[in-house]
Amino acid sequence: MSAKTLYDKLWESHVVHTEQDGGVLLYIDRQLLHEVTSPQAFSGLRAAGRKAWRIDANIATADHNVPTTDRAAGIADATSRLQVDTLDRNCAEFGIEEFGMHDKRQGIVHVIAPEQGLTLPGMTVVCGDSHTATHGALGALAFGIGTTEVEHVLATQCLWARKSRSMRIWVEGELGNGVTAKDLVLAIIGRIGTAGGTGYAIEFAGPAVHALSVEGRMTLCNMAIEAGARSGMVGVDAVTIDYLRGRPYAPVGKIWDQAVAVWGELHSDPDAQFDAEIRLEATDVAPQVTWGTSPEMVVDISARVPDPALEKDPVRRKGWSDALAYMDLAAATPISSIALDKVFIGSCTNARIEDLRAAAAVARGHHKAASVKAVLVVPGSGLVKAQAEAEGLDRIFRDAGFEWREPGCSMCLAMNADRLEPGERCASTSNRNFEGRQGAGGRTHLVSPAMAAAAAIAGHFVDVRDWIMH
């Protein structure tokens, strides 16, 4: 039998039917639903007189529109309130379990599914959200889909799809102190570009990747999308198994033992061939900061803003010039001199307990700079919030002048009350720095949680490695 990649194994085990043109009917093990991309899907079921085919394979939560301040006051914005209320009604009508706004398990969909054991190795996982790739960190095939496809999965638990090409990104060595999975994935995107992974399913592998926790691996897979890929994944190892053991929806007893035996095979075979392969040295990676309006516009903290005049490619040169104009930055500006108005620590990229611990370790005993208007710390779920409070992290943040919020997508995107005002500059642990992503006219710089906390205290970007040493 020929050697197979992890992607091959996951794909082939879910093929229901293959058409002559290469189209594949793929079985979907888990669908995750939220309030933004599901309403029309439920309406389609209702109009056709259909029920959900497998109620137990679908689970929902509200995350994009929920307020991160006083939940008891409800949702002020009428459109946001309608979306959340509609999700509640649809889930009740179709019998789908929902972690509602006042459920202690509620949170960002890509945080709650792994922490609940709803995402398991070997699964196919879909959601009407591009960052569904996050779940690949557990050895799953996970990807975002459109609203019409959400309806198809509700109705049939299957989906028409075409197989991607395979890419392996191998990271040798060990990340240095103060350098995180977020820095690694930003460095990868800086190298291959936001189109580098287009048409591929990316497997992250190598000693540096398998030295990461599952939460760090989720950060890598989460931003595979920003590299242009359809999905990202990491092979199963003992770290994966230990993470899942005892999760509420994970198997138990003999079924757990059987599952672990199967999961142990979910890695690429030693001789497996990939369509493309990229290799990096972890020791070469430093803390990263984006300077422009695309995740690929990123440099080390010690660098300066690039000069478009030095770029030979005319398309890239114009893109850089436009980005600098929007970001109100001059070429050759030291990254460390860029002052900030706000800081956001949260999102499906970096709002798990390890992320909050990293930020709190930097913030402990300090206070935000007077020039920084606000620092929002938004846990990824109610359970992450409770764990952080049990560890006293909330007190560290409050003592530092940071705001401790309720779980939700928050300032990752301007779809709720947490947003930037025109011209405001933000250090953000989220995944996208597009124009207007955090609010019309807002300027976003992507960083790790530790880098964000250090910037909040200094009032500008600093090398968190120096901060940790002192």
UniProtKB/Swiss-Prot annotation:
Keywords: 4Fe-4S, Amino-acid biosynthesis, Branched-chain amino acid biosynthesis, Iron, Iron-sulfur, Leucine biosynthesis, Lyase, Metal-binding. The keyword Metal-binding applies. InterPro entries: 3-IsopropMal_deHydase_lsu, Acnase/IPM_dHydase_lsu_aba_1/3, Acoase/IPM_deHydtase_lsu_aba, Aconitase_4Fe-4S_BS, Aconitase_4Fe-4S_dom, IPM_dehydratase_rel_enz, IPMI_cat. Pfam families: Aconitase. Pathway: Amino-acid biosynthesis; L-leucine biosynthesis; L-leucine from 3-methyl-2-oxobutanoate: step 2/4. [4Fe-4S] cluster binds at C348, C409, C412. Heterodimer of LeuC and LeuD. This is 3-isopropylmalate dehydratase large subunit. It comes from Acidithiobacillus ferrooxidans (strain ATCC 23270 / DSM 14882 / CIP 104768 / NCIMB 8455) (Ferrobacillus ferrooxidans (strain ATCC 23270)).
